[in-house]
Regions:
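Class I S-adenosyl-L-methionine
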Residues: 1-139
Length: 139
């Protein structure tokens, strides 16, 4: 299994893709109403080319690899010289442990500008988010 970063047409940089499901996109559910958030109802990662079999396999493999101990090192090798990197053209931060890995990657790639679109901001440790968002290379 090999980490495969995606390159979407509308973005000038590589991106990490995970499956867009409840296991990964924990922020898609409003925990008060138990309903899917409106912003997630039209998720582009659930239509179009995102349904192609190879893409689905790659996103699942990326998710599996993100749980391994060497994920941080793998990501650093993949993006270290890039000017920009977008986390998640599909998927999201799914656990505190993964959030900490994202923080490490961002710290160790200071010349890369990281964009981290997320719907999971309120679900994990706020101190970790503050550390991540304080980095000068994180948007």
């Amino acid at each position: 299994m090999i980490l495969k970063l995606s390159k979407t047409k509308k973005m000038p940089c590589k991106s990490l893709s995970f499956p867009a499901n409840k296991e990964v996109c924990k922020g898609m559910i409003d925990y008060v109403t138990k309903e899917m958030k409106d912003v997630c109802k039209g998720c582009y990662a659930k239509k179009g080319f995102y349904h192609m079999p190879n893409g689905k396999i790659n996103r699942q493999d990326n998710y599996t690899l993100s749980k391994q101990d060497n994920f941080v090192e793998t990501m650093i090798k993949e993006i270290n010289n890039d000017l920009y990197f977008r986390w998640f053209d599909s998927g999201d931060i799914y656990s505190q442990e993964f959030l900490e890995k994202v923080l490490e990657v961002c710290k160790l790639t200071p010349t890369t500008n990281h964009w981290i679109p997320t719907k999971s901001r309120e679900l994990f440790n706020q101190e970790t988010w503050v550390l991540l968002e304080a980095l000068p290379n994180v948007k």
